[in-house]
A protein has these predicted regions:
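Glycine-rich oxoanion-binding loops at beta->alpha junctions
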Residues: 45-90
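Glycine-rich phosphate/diphosphate-binding loop of Rossmann-like nucleotide-binding domains
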Residues: 1-46
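A short, gly/pro- and small-residue-rich
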Residues: 93-107
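Conserved small/polar residues in nucleotide/adenosyl-binding loops
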Residues: 146-152
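Glycine/threonine-rich flexible loop motifs
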Residues: 85-96, 121-124
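Short, glycine-/small-residue-rich phosphate/pyrophosphate-handling segment
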Residues: 108-144
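Residues at the C-terminal ends
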Residues: 25-27, 106, 136
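General beta-strand structural signal in soluble alpha/beta enzymes
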Residues: 32-34, 57, 80-81, 113-114, ...
Length: 156
């Protein structure tokens, strides 16, 4: 299975490294698409070492391949972990300020978002509305009880 692992810019980004390792050990091909803020928590070298592939961050890299469209279309699954409140809001609004946003808009496969944020942010009416809208559109929002860790369902 070809998986795009989007990584949001929250402290839980380091846990996505474990998720990536589990995906690759299970035999999946994984392309990591971190946000700029995610790279502040976990560097590109870590993602590349664990995936065996170059990290994708630039919408305009590999323009001849239409990188921002190809990644979303070729994936069998897109997982975003952690999905910060900001990333949930941008996704719900259909915004694509970076490569990950473009991938989410062009994905024709199942999309799973794993929220990770402080409880106050999770319960904010804007976040609640964004999650409801995403679910209405068919996006799976996998919820943990602490919202600071990646949902256990993603590690299975």
């Amino acid at each position: 299975m070809e998986i795009v692992l989007g990584v949001g810019g929250g402290i839980a980004a380091y846990k996505a490294a474990l998720l990536l390792r589990l995906m690759t050990e299970a035999g999946h091909g994984v392309t990591v698409v971190p946000t700029a803020n995610a790279l502040e928590f976990v560097g590109a070298a870590t993602w590349e070492a664990l995936s065996g592939r170059p990290v994708r961050t630039d919408t305009f890299e590999a323009v001849d391949e239409v990188n921002h469209v190809r990644l979303g279309r070729r994936a069998d699954l897109v997982v975003v972990a952690p999905a910060t409140a900001d990333l949930l809001a941008r996704t719900a609004a259909g915004m694509a300020p970076d490569l990950l946003g473009n991938v989410l808009l062009t994905a024709t496969c199942p999309v799973v978002l794993a929220p990770a944020m402080h409880t106050e942010m999770w319960h904010h009416p804007a976040t609640v509305a964004n999650v409801a809208l995403l679910r209405e559109r068919g996006v799976t929002v996998a919820v943990s009880y602490t919202h600071l860790t990646l949902p256990t369902i993603l590690l299975v």
